[in-house]
Amino acid sequence: MSKVLTSLPVGQRVGIAFSGGLDTSVAVAWMRENGAVPCTYTADIGQYDESDIASIPGRAEAYGAEISRLVDCREALVEEGLAALSCGAFHIRSGGRTYFNTTPLGRAVTATLLVRAMLADDVLIWGDGSTFKGNDIERFYRYGLLANPRLRIYKPWLDTAFVGELGGRKEMSEWLQERDLPYRDSAEKAYSTDANIWGATHEAKKLEHLDTGIEIVDPIMGVPFWDDSVEIATEDVTLSFVQGRPVAINGKEFDSPVDLVHEANAVGGRHGLGMSDQIENRIIEAKSRGIYEAPGMALLFIAYERLVNAIHNEDTIASYHNEGRRLGRLMYEGRWFDPQSLMLRESLQRWVGSAVTGEVTLRLRRGEDYSILDTTGPAFSYHPDKLSMERTEDAAFGPVDRIGQLTMRNLDIADSRAKLENYAQLGLVGQAQAELVGSLQSGGAEAIASVGTHEESDAGALDRAAMESGTD
């Protein structure tokens, strides 16, 4: 049976994720006028585009809300963001720039905590402002039902009665004015913005057109690094990590992780760090475009991955990137608390993040222009003496050892040569690649794998004996 209601549940409590903007203000007043009992829940997620969030519940009461609550989600959101950081749970990247999934992170925390708050008030119907074309409608649906399996969904924007009466911003404004209800109609912009403590998303309207660049965006978490008139001074910053968690910035520890993230945002924001322009695939596989800000996450991520590369081996790093990307997509789809995500999170945090302890010093300039000045830690796999070109005592291996290692490679090189000869016979190579690979005559593989003919040495006798009587 569908959990989605398409008409107003008259006489019942309906919880609304309330931002205080025009859309949700009208929704609350309209539901009250038409016989429902609206209850509003506002998430404090540290959003940088809201300067007076404490006043929002009071505004909701003016529109007829029976219950109006402010739910502090900041600590939970920071913790989930730090988990995503340690897992590298970011799948959207373009030209070396990363989108740090700040909106999906916010939705996971907001939906879960708001529905739990509604459940405590015995509010079992929930609505929000997401549209049917976007990602959020599915994210909120999934997280809402995980938090309250009895939850039903009512969205005024899916109700033909509401849309027919109040289909646009002009109609909404006039409707409130006719009833002498106050409202806060934000200035019309060339794009829409959604923000939380980890980042800001700018999308829609003019940004839907790919001939419009990042320069039309007015950053809310930092400076427009592309504007030459904005002075940006060079700054050195040291990030400290313990077991995959950032613990200090420039040697300063903070009373809470929330305070640390605020400081990271301030440092990164001063340089315009962490802004990116991305084309992505929505959950429904339609492509969309967004401009993103995440100065603090970008700053921490640079240092974190520097330490990951200094500490872990190649296969571990490959797994970190592969599984992190998969986890990022799952989060994007609203599956951050699904079993497959929990499995990946547990593995990445336990076996990758827990080993990441150290400090990285960066020199920040403008935008993504930075230098790494120093990298230190107690358990690096990076040991310069192992590969030093200078003469070293007690070296891990010597010239003769490398000759033996190269000889062992003859087996797979011979196999590759045999495949190339076969491909040449099939006409798959040696045509477009003729200048590079030349002609491939048969017999090359055998020549590579052959040991040649020479008098048997002691080593040869041992090898023959092992093959005759030993095991592999």
From Swiss-Prot:
Q: Where are the transmembrane segments?
A: none
> Which keywords does UniProt give here?
Amino-acid biosynthesis, Arginine biosynthesis, ATP-binding, Cytoplasm, Ligase, Nucleotide-binding
Q: Where does L-aspartate bind?
A: T131, N135, D136
> GO terms for biological process?
argininosuccinate metabolic process; L-arginine biosynthetic process; urea cycle
Cross-referenced PROSITE patterns: ARGININOSUCCIN_SYN_1 (PS00564), ARGININOSUCCIN_SYN_2 (PS00565)
User: Cellular location of this protein?
Assistant: Cytoplasm
Which residues does L-citrulline bind? Y99, N135, R139, S192, T201, E203, E280
Chain positions covered by the region annotation Disordered? 453-472
Reaction(s) this enzyme catalyzes, per UniProt: L-citrulline + L-aspartate + ATP = 2-(N(omega)-L-arginino)succinate + AMP + diphosphate + H(+)
The biological pathway it contributes to is: Amino-acid biosynthesis; L-arginine biosynthesis; L-arginine from L-ornithine and carbamoyl phosphate: step 2/3
EC annotation from Swiss-Prot or TrEMBL: 6.3.4.5
Q: Where does ATP bind?
A: A17, F18, S19, G20, G21, L22, D23, T24, S25, A43, G129, T131, D136, D194
A single GO molecular-function term is: protein homodimerization activity
State the InterPro entries in the record: Arg_succ_synth_type2_subfam, Arginosuc_syn_C, Arginosuc_syn_N, Arginosuc_synth, Arginosuc_synth_CS, Arginosuc_synth_type_1_subfam, AS_cat/multimer_dom_body, AS_multimer_C_tail
Where does it sit, as one GO cellular component term?
cytoplasm
Signal peptide segment: none
Question: Where is it chiefly localized?
Answer: cytoplasm
Belongs to which family? Answer: Belongs to the argininosuccinate synthase family. Type 2 subfamily.
Cited NCBIfam families: argG (TIGR00032), PRK05370.1 (NF003779)
Q: Tell me, how does this one assemble?
A: Homotetramer.
Question: Which protein are we looking at?
Answer: Argininosuccinate synthase
